[in-house]
């Protein structure tokens, strides 16, 4: 009836900005309410998240939890984890409520410690996909996570330098010939090897514009850290 995707966390930045620009706190309150409900319903005990939570539109109860673009409902779809890490980092930035940063870190640590995380730190499209290591990687998840980690490293968190160092390792991999396309190739996209949705047979092992976006954002954030 009312499916809500973890991707929506990325849109809350617009609502926070709308309050700043308009002076109307309604947008801020909507963003916080959305983040809080997502916090309570989208996450598993280990910190990983579902892709979709379907709500009953009449009473707000949960009808179903699933992972539409991942391997299975209970699997760890990599880009969903990236949206969660980045989105809750946004919420911490805008509210300074520590619970949001704690969730971002918990989800990141779940990804970092996944036994299937490759040595180059570019995740498989789903960390529970059945044919690992012969599964497509997802550079878009990696670039989004790296960008979020650079922001996290600027906050008063224990071992902040380790988040920066982990992001550096991701970016080193993405900038290598394994993932960064030669000039004039790859449809003029920067990064190769992203995945849209394997269950929908859509955008498999291709360049994606948002992979490039977060790669460029991460590069800028990394440069800003040296100022």
Where do the protein language model's features map onto the residues?
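Glycan-recognition and catalytic cores of secretory/periplasmic carbohydrate-active enzymes
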Residues: 1-227
